[in-house]
Regions:
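Long, highly hydrophobic alpha-helical transmembrane signal-anchor segments
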Residues: 2-65
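Core segments of transmembrane alpha-helices
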Residues: 13, 117-130, 178
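Small-residue-rich segments of transmembrane alpha-helices in multi-pass membrane proteins
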Residues: 13-18, 171-185
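Juxtamembrane boundary at the C-terminal end of a transmembrane helix
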Residues: 29, 182-193
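Transmembrane alpha-helical segments that form the membrane-embedded catalytic/substrate-channel core
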Residues: 54-72, 152-159
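Cytosolic, membrane-interface loops and tails of multi-pass inner-membrane proteins
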Residues: 63-114
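Short alpha-helical packing/oligomerization segments
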Residues: 130-151
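Interfacial loop-to-transmembrane junctions
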Residues: 154-179
Length: 193
């Protein structure tokens, strides 16, 4: 069987490079005034965050596929080895199907699945808070919070696999960014009434 994880792995490498290029561009982006976005040019830093957001989403999605393919290959090899090394030939280890591995929700597959699901769960409040903060408070501040949020989301697959409370290293900063941006935007909106 061909190594099916090569396609998603190559996409992961390309997306990681794109994410790094966007981050480098954002780091070199200077001269953005503080305060609410007044035109499209002042939204530049936020647009870079949105580009990185899409790259990270697809990176997590391709990682989810690559993980399922590699776990499937590993479990098939283990089943084959168990069948060929069993004494007397009576034990016949059945290799799991790709669907059983992909939707079984165990081990590395569970971590990859949760990384995608958690990212998607956090997407609506993050995007709303990011854009409201940029429009009502500060585009550069929204971009800074956006980069922190993306960093917190990026480490989720790694900390999810660790014992609790490691996952809080990802979730708490992300919640904090969303809460801060949204609270500041709501305060700015209310103070203008």
């Amino acid at each position: 069987m061909a190594n099916l994880s090569l396609l998603p792995q190559s996409a992961i490498a390309g997306l990681a490079a794109a994410l790094a290029a966007i981050a480098a561009k954002a780091h070199s982006h200077a001269g953005v005034p503080s305060g609410p976005a007044t035109d499209l040019a002042s939204l530049g830093p936020v647009v870079l965050v949105l580009g990185a957001f899409v790259c990270l989403l697809y990176l997590l999605l391709f990682n989810q596929s690559a993980t399922a393919f590699s776990e499937h290959a590993r479990l098939r090899a283990a089943a084959k080895a168990k069948t060929t090394t069993s004494s007397g030939g009576s034990a016949n280890a059945k290799a799991p199907s790709l669907a059983e591995v992909k939707y079984g929700g165990k081990g590395a597959v569970l971590a990859a699945d949760r990384a995608v699901a958690n990212f998607l769960e956090q997407t609506p409040p993050f995007l709303l808070a990011l854009l409201l903060h940029a429009a009502l408070v500060s585009a550069s501040g929204a971009a800074r919070c956006g980069w922190i949020w993306l960093g917190a989301r990026a480490i989720y697959p790694f900390v999810f696999a660790k014992p609790f409370p490691a996952v809080l290293l990802s979730t708490l900063p992300a919640y904090g960014c969303v809460g801060f941006m949204l609270a500041a935007a709501l305060l700015a909106a209310v103070s203008g009434w």
